């Protein structure tokens, strides 16, 4: 059995991850659940908090306290929290599955350095459908080339704090790479006022925030006479959680390295 720890186990995504781990039993089992230091939930049963019944896994407020109880840590927390956990797991030799978004160049460099010592799966989105979409986007960009104007539209719930979403940015990176472009040079984030005619090589991003939208992404390839749209809509966080657990199981026995869901799904 793969012993899995969930960071932020009291949050919305954390509870879903706890449930997803148990759904893969006996291949995986929740053996540690971590909440923020000082939380009133320390000692509470992780299964009961996730409405699964008692699992016998008490909430802890420290990785140090449960270091001998897990093989891989699943972490969807904020960047500053994830980086502390990364440093701990790197020192302790623990594998990680990371779904944190909003990372900058420095944070990604730290991930790359840690990947030289421990196995890590890092992805902006763990949905199987989204990762299949990335493969389709690469194909579409290569076929349509410079003939298409490309726009990426994403929508999420009102509580999401980063924009564009990590998934939208990853989609942009895949498309830009296929076209031999640098996303940082060609990305346009929103438009307002008298913008002038659209420059052919730009990749546009539009963001919508509202309600309880789990995550919608559409990429528009607009050419003269026709449009191609590739859309993915998530209706439940469970799709991300199941993908993360799949990644955790895939890491079993892997050598150190920085992997993503394209590796897990053999889509390279």
Curated annotation (Swiss-Prot):
Keywords: Amino-acid biosynthesis, Cytoplasm, Diaminopimelate biosynthesis, Lysine biosynthesis, NAD, NADP, Oxidoreductase
GO MF term list: 4-hydroxy-tetrahydrodipicolinate reductase; NAD binding; NADP binding; oxidoreductase activity, acting on CH or CH2 groups, NAD or NADP as acceptor
Pathway(s) of this molecule: Amino-acid biosynthesis; L-lysine biosynthesis via DAP pathway; (S)-tetrahydrodipicolinate from L-aspartate: step 4/4
Residues noted as binding (S)-2,3,4,5-tetrahydrodipicolinate in the record, renumbered to the chain: 157, 166-167
Cellular localisation: Cytoplasm
Chain positions recorded as NADP(+) binding sites: 36
Main location: cytoplasm
GO cellular component terms attached to this protein's record: cytosol
InterPro entries found in the cross-reference section: DapB_C, DapB_N, DapB_N_CS, DHDPR_bac, NAD(P)-bd_dom_sf
Enzyme class label: oxidoreductase
EC number(s) reported in the record: 1.17.1.8
Biological processes annotated in GO: diaminopimelate biosynthetic process; lysine biosynthetic process via diaminopimelate
Annotated catalysed reactions: (S)-2,3,4,5-tetrahydrodipicolinate + NAD(+) + H2O = (2S,4S)-4-hydroxy-2,3,4,5-tetrahydrodipicolinate + NADH + H(+); (S)-2,3,4,5-tetrahydrodipicolinate + NADP(+) + H2O = (2S,4S)-4-hydroxy-2,3,4,5-tetrahydrodipicolinate + NADPH + H(+)
Gene3D superfamilies: Dihydrodipicolinate Reductase, domain 2, NAD(P)-binding Rossmann-like Domain
Active-site residues from the entry: 156, 160
Family, similarity comment: Belongs to the DapB family.
Function: Catalyzes the conversion of 4-hydroxy-tetrahydrodipicolinate (HTPA) to tetrahydrodipicolinate.
Protein name according to UniProt: 4-hydroxy-tetrahydrodipicolinate reductase
Organism per entry: Pseudomonas fluorescens (strain ATCC BAA-477 / NRRL B-23932 / Pf-5)
């Amino acid at each position: 059995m793969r012993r899995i720890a969930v960071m932020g186990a009291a949050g919305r995504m954390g509870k879903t991850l706890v449930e997803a781990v148990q759904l893969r039993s006996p291949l995986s089992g929740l053996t540690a659940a971590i909440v923020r230091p000082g939380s009133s939930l320390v000692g509470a049963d992780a299964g009961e908090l996730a409405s699964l019944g008692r699992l016998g896994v008490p909430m802890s407020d420290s990785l140090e306290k449960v270091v001998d109880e897990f093989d891989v840590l699943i972490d969807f927390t904020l960047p500053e929290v994830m980086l502390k956990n990364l440093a701990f797991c790197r020192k302790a030799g623990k594998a990680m599955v990371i779904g944190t978004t909003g990372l900058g160049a420095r944070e990604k460099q730290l991930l790359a350095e840690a990947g030289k010592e421990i196995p890590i799966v890092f992805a902006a989105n763990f949905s199987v459908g989204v990762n299949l979409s990335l493969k389709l986007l690469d194909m579409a960009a290569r076929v349509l080339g410079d003939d298409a104007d490309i726009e990426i539209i994403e929508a999420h719930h009102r509580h999401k704090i980063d924009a564009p979403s990590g998934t939208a940015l990853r989609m942009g990176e895949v498309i830009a790479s296929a076209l031999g472009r640098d996303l940082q040079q060609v990305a346009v984030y929103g438009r307002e006022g008298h913008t002038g005619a659209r420059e052919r090589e730009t990749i546009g991003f539009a963001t919508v925030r509202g309600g309880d939208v789990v995550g919608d992404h559409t990429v528009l390839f607009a050419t003269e006479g026709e449009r191609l749209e590739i859309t993915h809509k998530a209706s439940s966080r469970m799709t991300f959680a199941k993908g993360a657990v799949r990644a955790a199981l895939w890491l079993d026995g892997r050598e150190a390295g920085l992997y993503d869901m394209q590796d897990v799904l053999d889509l390279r």
